[in-house]
């Protein structure tokens, strides 16, 4: 599992952030709350992550603190609830 990513914020949209780490760009799906607290383009950021693995996709979800990530991990264990941000 990828526990966190520290790198440069390259950009973001309404659902995700693009973070560059040593020349590799990671697209991280995040909530509006998390995205709004990241900072500005070019800032160094630290994002806690959860790698969601399905047979047809790998999705990296990002969080601003451990409480938010723990809640996400508990919610996705409930039948019928998926990880969509």
Region roles according to the model:
Residues 4-6, 10-85:
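Long, highly charged, low-complexity intrinsically disordered interaction regions
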């Amino acid at each position: 599992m990828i526990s966190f990513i520290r790198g440069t914020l390259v950009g973001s949209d309404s659902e995700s952030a693009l973070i560059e780490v040593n020349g590799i760009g990671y697209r991280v799906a995040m909530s509006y709350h998390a995205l709004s607290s990241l900072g500005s383009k070019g800032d160094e950021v630290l994002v806690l992550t959860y790698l969601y693995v399905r047979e047809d996709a790998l999705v990296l979800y990002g969080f601003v603190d451990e409480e938010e990530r723990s809640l996400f991990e508990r919610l996705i264990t409930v039948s019928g609830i998926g990880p969509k941000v």
